[in-house]
Design a protein with these regions (language model features):
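Short, surface-exposed charged micro-motifs
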Residues: 67
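Basic, Lys/Arg-enriched alpha-helical interface segments
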Residues: 1-63, 72-76, 83-113
Length: 113
């Protein structure tokens, strides 16, 4: 099975690098699964962000989320990562993910010309 490359949008890579070691390792392993065409162990679709966007859910005493889109053949795009501090999805984080997805879709459309 071929492995899709990861493309990090915005500060998503730096954010994951700043997570605690255990969280970072879990996030890395789950993204590796996605690159191989497998589902993460704990995920849910995020249609409120956009079609095909999914959320990796990481539970380690604190809650962390990684939002990505893997529906494109060329790569897995990591849209956003954050620590979730409330039960509800923070609107600021949803906004960031939507904005990055919109930029990605526009860039892909320009490349196809």
């Amino acid at each position: 099975m071929s492995e899709k490359p990861l493309i990090w949008l915005g500060d998503s890579r730096e954010t994951i690098r700043a997570f605690a070691d255990d969280v970072r390792k879990i996030a890395g392993f789950q993204l590796w699964r996605v690159q191989r065409g497998l589902e993460p162990n704990d995920w849910k679709p995020m249609p409120s962000v956009g079609l095909g966007v999914q959320e990796i859910r990481i539970h380690t005493g604190t809650e962390h989320r990684v939002l990505y889109v893997a529906k494109f053949a060329e790569a897995v795009y990591v849209l956003h990562a954050f620590e979730k501090r409330t039960r509800r999805m923070p609107q600021d984080d949803l906004h960031v993910a939507r904005q990055r997805l919109r930029l990605l879709i526009n860039q892909r459309a320009r490349r196809k010309g």
